[in-house]
Regions:
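Bacterial N-terminal signal peptides that target proteins for export
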Residues: 1-10
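Bacterial N-terminal signal peptides
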Residues: 9-18
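Boundary at the C-terminal end of the N-terminal hydrophobic targeting segment
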Residues: 24-27
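Short, aromatic-enriched amphipathic alpha-helices that serve as compact interaction elements
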Residues: 29-46
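Short, well-ordered alpha-helical segments enriched in acidic and aromatic residues
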Residues: 34, 47-75
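Hydrophobic pocket/interface hotspot
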Residues: 38, 58, 135
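Surface-exposed, charged secondary-structure patches
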Residues: 63, 67-118
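Short beta-strand edge/turn micro-motifs at domain boundaries
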Residues: 121-146
Length: 146
């Protein structure tokens, strides 16, 4: 009788793990959340005017090929991810709104990002690719407000 109760508890525990854990893993890392996390980190660096290429966390968010391209281009690298040019309209009070993702292929996503501040509104499109189990930003382009 006691063995039966233990066996039932073990089976129920395995069922709970099987049902709830995969959903928790999927919910924890979506392209939208990844892009929002990147911009929350990036905007702090933007306001501090740091050289983004010296940041150790950049390769965690951005694809190596894009980093190499930006290093070769050597344009105002700080402004690439916001597509705002050299204006300093962003500040730490800027709100980042990430809209619904569009899945292009199994490993490529299009994520619209809106920057809203007191005196500005800007929209960019983040192209995010999935390599293995992690996401990386492959490219950013500007967009018209929609």
């Amino acid at each position: 009788m006691r063995f039966r109760k233990i066996l039932i508890c073990v089976i129920m525990g395995m069922l709970c793990l099987g049902l709830f854990c995969p959903k928790a893993v999927d919910a924890a890392q979506t392209p939208q959340e990844f892009v929002k996390e990147f911009y929350e980190w990036y905007l702090v660096r933007y306001c501090e005017l740091v050289d983004i290429f010296k940041e150790e966390k950049l390769p965690e968010y951005v694809d190596e090929s894009l980093i190499e391209y930006l290093k070769k281009k050597r344009s105002p690298d700080l402004y690439y991810f916001t597509q705002m040019g050299e204006t300093m309209q962003f500040n730490k009070d800027c709100r980042v709104l990430v809209k619904n993702v569009l899945t292009m292929t199994d490993d490529m996503y299009v994520v619209p990002v809106i920057f809203k501040g007191k005196d500005f509104y800007n929209v960019v499109i983040a192209y995010v690719k999935k390599s293995g189990s992690e996401f990386k930003i492959a490219s950013i382009s500007d967009a018209y407000p929609y």
